[in-house]
Amino acid sequence: MEAFEISDFKEHAKKKSMWAGALNKVTISGLMGVFTEDEDLMALPIHRDHCPALLKIFDELIVNATDHERACHSKTKKVTYIKISFDKGVFACENDGPGIPIAKHEQASLIAKRDVYVPEVASCHFLAGTNINKAKDCIKGGTNGVGLKLAMVHSQWAILTTADGAQKYVQHINQRLDIIEPPTITPSREMFTRIELMPVYQELGYAQPLSETEQADLSAWIYLRACQCAAYVGKGTTIYYNDKPCNTGSVMALAKMYTLLSAPNSTIHTTAIKADAKPYSLHPLQVAAVVSPKFKKFEHVSIINGVNCVKGEHVTFLKKTINEMVVKKFQQTIKDKNRKTTLRDSCSNIFVVIVGSIPGIEWTGQRKDELSIAENVFKTHYSIPSSFLTNMTRSIVDILLQSISKKDNHKQVDVDKYTRANAGGKKAQDCMLLAAEGDSALSLVRAGLTLGKSNPSGPSFDFCGMISLGGVIMNACKKVTNITTDSGETIMVRNEQLTNNKVLQGIVQVLGLDFNCHYKTQEERAKLRYGCIVACVDQDLDGCGKILGLLLAYFHLFWPQLIIHGFVKRLLTPLIRVYEKGKTVPVEFYYEQEFDAWAKKQTSLANHTVKYYKGLAAHDTHEVKSMFKHFDNMVYTFTLDDSAKELFHIYFGGESELRKRELCTGVVPLTETQTQSIHSDRQIPCSLHLQVDTKAYKLDAIERQIPNFLDGMTRARRKILAGGLKCFASNNRERKVFQFGGYVADHMFYHHGDMSLNTSIIKAAQYYPGSSHLYPVFIGIGSFGSRHLGGKDAGSPRYISVQLASEFIKTMFPAEDSWLLPYVFEDGQRAEPEYYVPVLPLAIMEYGANPSEGWKYTTWARQLEDILALVRAYVDKNNPKHELLHYAIERKITVLPLRPSNYNFKGHLKRFGQYYYSYGTYVVSEQRNIITITELPLRVPTVAYIESIKKSSNRMAFIEEIIDYSSSETIEILVKLKPNSLNRIVEEFKETEEQDSIENFLRLRNCLHSHLNFVKPKGGIIEFNSYYEILYAWLPYRRDVYQKRLMRERAVLKLRIIMETAIVRYINESADLNLSHYEDEKEASRILSEHGFPPLNQSLITSPEFASIEELNQKALQGCYTYILSLQARELLIAAKTRRVEKIKKMQARLDKVEQLLQESPFPGASVWLEEIDAVEKAIIKGRSTQWKFH
């Protein structure tokens, strides 16, 4: 009886949850797939407007029944069935189990002044009910005891029947509670409760009686609620609708009912969400989730405490947890930082069913169907099983990736620098798209196409379109992620950078390409807007090796069938034209190998002019007209052979180890047979292009980024040094950086832009603590950067100047070596050496760091004293360490120290295990609560260091302020600590064997870890394991230089002695020979030959320069007698003869010295090397003492 106590109406009415919803209709639409009793699929549409108050009438009676089922769940007499029926507008709900107590209610009887029983109070009196005041662990769905009364108020009639095991109670309520008839009470052993009623439909916006459509719509909705209740109560209680059991006794069955029509054959993931504390732990939530691309937004059905809950914190908790997992998995899978997934994206393909009980919740909203509970309840107490989240996440990410792939196919961009062909439509297959490398190439294409009017046999805009590739193409192979879904399907996902790339997306739009089409059939290819694409690129490494290779890789990645069917072509323009004197038609060569083979067959090229055309812009108007006149013969088609797939993967894929193995060897040049085959078939196999042009570009890129181990220089720095030796040879006056850069670009054929060249020149002159070069090539005049910003604060190339550090450079790189080195030839002219071999191993004497094609290059300069000691021990047989070092080299072991350089470094170097570490220094002032940093670790710029500390939140928690008073030479950084921080720092940043607490706190230590990857002399990469290995590999190269230098000098001296001796002899015999009496030079030469004078190549002997010993020996004695016949009268005088005799004596003395040096031990020229080592050391000492000004 206490459960039905009548409460104060005023307090009761204040609750927002007293409101039951609007009396007007709202639209309820949807389509559900459901099971009938025999499991035949049936679709029940709900598409009419309905009144929320009417639906609430039905729903409240159903919820009362499920509440009763839950209340009796632990009792002896349980609820075994709930029967729901709806026929001709009459709604009924019945359940067994204990009925409403049939007893007189004293308080209500006193108020009504008649006998009132508890069933009447429960159904007809607004101030009484079991749900008015609920405990915190209550799981009832009813609220405030209003539901049954609301049903009675809106009913024409109602019949309440209940039996409590002793009596049966039947009462009729008519005219919306206006007439409450006395109950009929009879003895009965039954236990059940049944409520049957006829709502006042007309007042709620319906026909009275209901129309057939209204009856069907309401019946479908009630049936749905019955199925939901079946899932809620579970298998212990049967739910009937119109006497048929509902077969949705589990959360999975309910999920199938909702999704079988809309998403058939979808996997349903199920789990139980459990809590860790009472009362929540007593009631786990059952969850079933369906993931399907057919769902376009997140939807859920939530049956909580028997109520069809439209929203609540439990749903938010589930969504957020899934989203966190999806975002993490998505980023790990796609590896694209620019692609983001939102909560909406991650949950848009999910349909979730949640069934269960949650204690202590409140119901809000007009229809009391919005769950309200403190949000932290779920975060604190509930957890979702990881296996469920993992499976869900995998399915969701697969769908997201598929949707991204489809969306990206329709990405539209503005296409710049595109001119379409005039023809199109039915003639599209006859059109070609000319893709020019850049603006200058586009100008050539435009010039060629506009010649169409005067050149009928050539191409024109009628059937040709043109587009610019913008001078660069993105490597698409590294911008996709291949993902295998659970179903085994492989999805290629393009990242955001690729889909937003204007150049490649522009090609897709212009050609009409579809990423979802393979173009295997002619019908598919006929849909394209052009019949082919023709690449028009420069004949240099950037054009052929890089841009054309990337374009081919793009088509091979997405549409290999187009390459197979000849869709991708190139305009092969002449690389070299040779103009013979007196002829107007040049000989054209498309590959250097062709030119080399032709040149070898010529007796001389003296009467030929050789012109290189590495850039398309080099062709003049006449040459363009000639090329486009024979345009068809210059268009070559790419073919796709079996090995191309692997090579595309090697050169453009993400597996750097494969590429590194391939690039360890040099390029194998095209053979004459291969070039002939290319021209005869006008076809270029992709594999051949990749193995020659692309590989050459990759190796060239490596040589621009990673130094050669012989000289420690990249190609750019080598060009700068060679240019400096040439430019400053006669006059070492200072020159502006930009002026010197122009000289290098002109004389050393630098093709990568003024900005990068000027930057390299500035770096070569930088000399400050922490700079890359401890031994600068140039003397910088002006501001060349400081330690503060790591050299980035250098002045403009227009304002700062350089001059050669000649005293150091000329000792480190002896001029005599220049004739022995192999050289790079650009445009047929000699440029810089392929490598230098300096007197000391410069590769381990300076700092450096750079990545290239999967390799990392990192070196830490070694101590000059150690290097000098090692090299001298190797060279000098009298050195006490000489034999020991040679023993170590033979066995590849280390015996002498080779420590990191500490020059210009005021910190400390320590070794732990196999690595050295550099340490900064500091001073602690406990009184001022300040730490003063007086040195930073090696090669750490000041500003970068301070920024790294400020980004560390756990360090800044102790720091009040950082003040930088450092100069370019010294470090003075004041770290002001917060009060009482010093002891806390010592506690939190523990001291270890390797560093103390302050060093740890201020990050005053770095590891000198090295990646000793260098370019080999003949190309490719060599990986060293130690600095000793580099030294040991370098030593034989430098040693051989001296033998080659001496042998060459010996050959030259011998030839010059022969020539000078012959001239002296001729002077002595000139009177007898009397050559002036002969009519011509030929007759005179005959006489000299008969008298045993040797014919000599005077120019070669006088200026041997780059001639090798073999050339000297072969060509020097195959000359003529010009060296004698060109002698003037004054050269026949006795004084002149005397000078020549003295010259011969000096040359003979030098020759004897050279012969002696060649016989030296331990190798020829060892003493010369020692002398040059001494000279380099003196230059370095002087340079360091004068800040490399040498004055």
Swiss-Prot record:
Residues annotated for Mg(2+) 1 binding in this entry: E437, D538
EC number: 5.6.2.2
Alphabetical list of Pfam families matching this protein: DNA_topoisoIV, TOPRIM_C
Name this protein carries in UniProt: DNA topoisomerase 2
Top-level division of the source organism's lineage: Viruses
UniProt keyword list: ATP-binding, DNA-binding, Early protein, Host cytoplasm, Isomerase, Magnesium, Metal-binding, Nucleotide-binding, Topoisomerase
Compartment(s) where it occurs, according to its Swiss-Prot or TrEMBL record: Host cytoplasm
Family: Belongs to the type II topoisomerase family.
Positions contributing to Mg(2+) 2 binding: D538, D540
Induction data: Expressed in the early phase of the viral replicative cycle.
Residues holding ATP: N64, N95, G142, T143, N144, G145, V146, G147, L148, K149
Record's GO cellular component terms: host cell cytoplasm
Active-site residue list: Y799
Any single biological process term in GO: sister chromatid segregation
